[in-house]
């Protein structure tokens, strides 16, 4: 594949970024806010300056996983910044792309989780996690765009305001939800989740929040909360079953 063939963001065009109907009010409020308009100006300027920006569909997580169907939330930081990697879902890579080290550790943890039976597993021929998203796993990055070869290049430019509202919307729903918070960046959302639940008259315990280190090889085995051995995937399914919900086929 030539560089020019790699899917990328070609313009600021939210009308071409589909989202599920129940996410539309959240997205529209953000897009018309001053923060949303400032982000639009920034992205347009970077594109005009020749920046290569990924992914092609920044809001894809909100298209594949409607709010009413969310069972599990996995929070990432920002999209992969290599050509052809990002597909708009946290930790997921486009079909045919070799899974990065963090995703390899995620698959390794699933394979060793003693609470998961073969019926809870699906074969992964590549690193795409679209099948999870379609089962109700919201794979949400805090920042939804990135420039090629420049991690965190769009951090602090406004996307975080939208993704915080997404987290708050999930924390407000009546359905039981599991939040998997890996690493300090994701765990910073724990207070937001609890505060939102309380504001809605829910006990924080109504949702299950599990924390561990980030699955990156740099931290996956580091105490006191190593990712490898955390058992989060089996615990999530046990919680869903306890609340009358179908488990996730990981």
Curated annotation (Swiss-Prot):
Protein's GO biological process: base-excision repair, AP site formation via deaminated base removal
EC number(s) reported in the record: 3.2.2.27
Subcellular compartments: Cytoplasm
Keyword field contains DNA damage: yes
SMART domains to which the protein is assigned, alphabetical: UDG, UreE_C
Main location class: cytoplasm
GO cellular component: cytoplasm
Highest rank taxon of the organism: Bacteria
Catalyzed reactions: Hydrolyzes single-stranded DNA or mismatched double-stranded DNA and polynucleotides, releasing free uracil
InterPro entries per the UniProt record, alphabetical: UDG_fam1 (IPR002043), Ura-DNA_Glyclase_AS (IPR018085), Uracil-DNA_glycosylase-like (IPR005122), Uracil-DNA_glycosylase-like_sf (IPR036895)
Swiss-Prot/TrEMBL keywords: Cytoplasm, DNA damage, DNA repair, Hydrolase
UniProt cross-references to CDD domains, sorted A to Z: UDG-F1-like
Residues at the catalytic site: 78
Entry GO MF terms: uracil DNA N-glycosylase activity
PANTHER family, A to Z: URACIL-DNA GLYCOSYLASE
Its biological purpose: Excises uracil residues from the DNA which can arise as a result of misincorporation of dUMP residues by DNA polymerase or due to deamination of cytosine.
Family per similarity comment: Belongs to the uracil-DNA glycosylase (UDG) superfamily. UNG family.
Database matches in NCBIfam families: PRK05254.1-1 (NF003588), PRK05254.1-2 (NF003589), PRK05254.1-4 (NF003591), PRK05254.1-5 (NF003592), ung (TIGR00628)
Protein name (record): Uracil-DNA glycosylase
Organism (species): Albidiferax ferrireducens (strain ATCC BAA-621 / DSM 15236 / T118) (Rhodoferax ferrireducens)
Taxon lineage: Bacteria, Pseudomonadati, Pseudomonadota, Betaproteobacteria, Burkholderiales
């Amino acid at each position: 594949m030539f560089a020019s063939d790699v899917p990328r963001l070609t313009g600021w065009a939210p009308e071409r970024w589909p989202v599920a109907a129940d996410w539309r009010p959240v997205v529209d409020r953000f897009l018309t806010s001053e923060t949303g308009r400032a982000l639009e100006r920034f992205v347009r300027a970077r594109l005009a300056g020749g920046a290569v920006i990924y992914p092609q569909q920044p809001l894809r997580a909100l298209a594949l996983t409607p709010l009413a169907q969310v069972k599990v939330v996995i929070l990432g930081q920002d999209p992969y910044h290599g050509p052809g990697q990002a597909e708009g879902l946290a930790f997921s890579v486009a079909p045919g792309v070799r899974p990065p080290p963090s995703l390899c550790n995620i698959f390794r943890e699933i394979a060793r989780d003693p609470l998961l039976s073969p019926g809870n597993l699906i074969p992964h021929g590549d690193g795409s996690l679209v099948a999870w998203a379609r089962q109700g796993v919201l794979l949400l990055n805090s920042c939804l765009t990135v420039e090629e070869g420049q991690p965190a290049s769009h951090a602090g430019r406004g996307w975080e305001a939208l993704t915080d509202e997404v987290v708050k919307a999930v924390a407000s729903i009546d359905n039981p939800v599991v939040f998997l918070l890996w690493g300090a960046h994701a765990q910073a959302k724990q207070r937001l989740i609890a505060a939102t639940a309380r504001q809605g008259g829910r006990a924080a315990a109504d949702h299950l929040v599990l924390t561990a280190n980030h699955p990156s090889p740099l931290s996956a085995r580091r105490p006191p909360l190593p990712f490898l051995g955390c058992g989060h995937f089996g615990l999530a399914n046990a919680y869903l079953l306890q609340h009358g919900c179908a488990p996730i086929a990981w």
